[in-house]
């Protein structure tokens, strides 16, 4: 039974008080509580409580560092707030054990572990090493305080770690709740905004991104436009408020933007998923996917530095649609399905969709388009208020409904000026859903106002590997008037219908055409050719090309139709296997004469080298030959018109034939051209090798003067009628 003390004044000599106080002395000494209660019901501090107060006082006054002393040198600790450096770990330690028996003596060359241990009631670390260890732990980030919405000075941890999430604003993902207004404050604040928690976030409004915003849409996150909202999901502040250009905006991550187009009714700019205009530096991508946009997934305009890497589409119209001015663009890895063009560059547009400003597309580098399905992979078109300058498009794969790359005119886009364009590494198959289309099409389609509808200074097409067996690989057309000043096609497909075609008379011109480096198997079709020309080609250069034709009924190196024009052609290292003719002019006379220069040319089989219909052709040959033929068809044939030969052709058969008043002759000089001289129109001073043994001059080297052919070995002569 507990002893009941008296209320006698102090000092009391009552045995009851004596016994009670004995218990209180034990409580004072041994209790871990901070206080005990005396017989008058008053509280006093225990030894533990006194220690606590002393510790708080020492903390308030700070620690006393024993300068020059360490565990290595040894030291004497006289007070609880004195600390000693352990050089082994760079940590300061204080002694929390008893000082009842005097100071704590630390021998030289000791450690905290060897002089009492590290634990409460012994040595404990009080320096920054403990803090560093705690912060370095996986849970260390939880030790750093952060206030959402607070502005931290640059260079501080708070500044570096600051970002915002919907959850910080009380917003959770939901497939039913519309939370657009709930995040207005978050987007107004800008900075780093992170949709990290997977789920659907439904907005009924456009979220406006301020300058400096870095928006992260994480994996499993879908930002969806509510039914009937009829607005873009994202705009930037400059565009939304017609204000100064935004410095930097980023939209990144592998989440999804769902325009929900099946449940929107608007047309025009409201049908875009995102509109971003007036930005110095814009970065979009990271695997982000746009679905269900009724018009462009991304409409981007007036950007100085555009970076678009890793865009994914499943949408009804264009994927990434760019309008000028855009001064530097780095575009990589676009993929998916687009109802129209996956990547479009338009200077101007239809009125409902046009936010462009006068200016150029310059320094544009696009690579890696993977078309699961696209109407076209890339489209380039303009209205004359700017130019396309220094463009490279590379690496297009998959399937396109129509052409892979298209440069063309339209009702509102009547003048396209391209300064420098490179298109390379094209593997996508055009015309995948039906009618065959060219891999690359340049076509003004009859739209224009003045001058040229399409004018291209330099076009380089390299590594064109698209397999197309029913249409020209590169198709040049238009009835208004278009020109390509310099076109190079380097690296040709293995199989083809035709490589390049100029498909309209009088309205199309190519100043300089070069086609090179390929070993092609052509379809057995009358229009199969390396070049098909109905218009004007000033210089036609074909180099290092092997042409494999199925038969001698079809196929040609150059198919020249009616009144087309070719001023000069240079063919170097060209191999023709079978085929109908190398140079094949049909229908009616060409406009003007042509120089055809053949170097290291081989015609293998019964196909002809050149035939004209009512036209004038000069053929200069160097190291040329015709092999594996029977002479059933002559190498050269003039159906009306005239062919002038010079140089060297190795063959064992007569090389010339004519009808309909056609003329074949040589230039003056000695030529290694085997032929029947009775078929060769005489030109004074010309020398060839006669193969017609029935002529009075006999076979062999002959020279003509005033229509008299003289055998240079026998002296025998033959007088020609032509």
Predicted regions and their residues:
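Non-transmembrane elongated oligomeric "stalk/shaft" segments that connect baseplates/barrels to distal
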Residues: 1-195, 215
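Gly/Ser/Thr/Ala-enriched C-terminal appendages of enzymes
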Residues: 413-499, 503-512, 523
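Viral virion structural and adsorption modules
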Residues: 1-9, 685, 695-700, 706-722
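Short glycine/acidic-rich loop motifs that flank beta-strands on beta-rich extracellular proteins
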Residues: 204-205, 225-231, 260-265, 272, ...
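All-beta strand scaffolds that present successive hydrophobic residues in beta-strands
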Residues: 215-218, 246-253, 282-286, 305-310, ...
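Extracellular beta-strand-rich solenoid/capping regions of secreted or surface-exposed proteins
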Residues: 110-118, 180-188, 200-216, 224-252, ...
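Extracellular beta-strand solenoid repeats
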Residues: 124, 194, 202, 208, ...
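Beta-strand-rich, repetitive solenoid scaffolds
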Residues: 85, 115, 124-127, 224, ...
